[in-house]
Regions:
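Conserved, structured C-terminal
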Residues: 1-169
């Protein structure tokens, strides 16, 4: 990124420590989310991989419609001092859906079941988009930094899942 910032007179800052995340997922997650926001979170207004700023449970948040679980789901990021309030709002609103908490290890297990790779765990900076299968997310009709190299990538290596069928576990 640094090699291109001067061309566009921009700066960037890592703000990871300014946000903490929660995830809601499952077939009723949209209904739950709609109960705690005034924004329209219908499929047509908040599509897969969309990101929005909105208030969730009265808390300013960044919401991403994406999930490692293999189900409909959302990642919600808030300032650390709002995380407990948001969690309590979600759990209260989710009672009618029989909501249950799940942790990071469960989430990581579910992402493996759906073959959804994670940066630094499964993917490294030296892997190409084609090798990881992430090239399906590239809009080749747009210009972007690295497009020329990405188009040249005709390598034969590709990460694939290994699925073992067993009846004795």
């Amino acid at each position: 990124f640094e090699s291109h910032t001067n061309k566009f007179n921009l700066t960037y800052k890592n703000r990871s420590d300014e946000f903490h995340g929660l995830s809601i997922a499952g077939p009723k997650s949209r209904e739950l989310l709609q109960k705690i926001t005034r924004d329209d979170v219908s499929n047509s207004k908040l599509k897969f991989r969309d990101s929005r700023h909105m208030f969730i449970g009265g808390v300013p948040a960044i919401i991403n419609r994406i999930s490692f679980t293999g189900e409909l789901g959302y990642e919600i990021y808030v300032a650390p001092h709002f995380q407990l309030k948001l969690y309590e709002e979600i759990m209260e609103a989710g009672k009618e859906f029989n909501i249950k908490p799940f942790g990071g290890r469960a989430l990581m297990s579910m992402r493996l079941e759906k073959n959804w790779g994670a940066w630094t765990l499964d993917y490294r900076p030296d892997f190409t988009a084609k090798e990881t299968g992430l090239d399906i997310f590239i809009n080749w009709d747009k210009d972007f930094i690295g497009k020329e190299n990405a188009q040249k990538d005709q390598g034969s290596n590709q990460l694939v899942p290994l699925i073992v069928q067993t009846n004795d576990i």
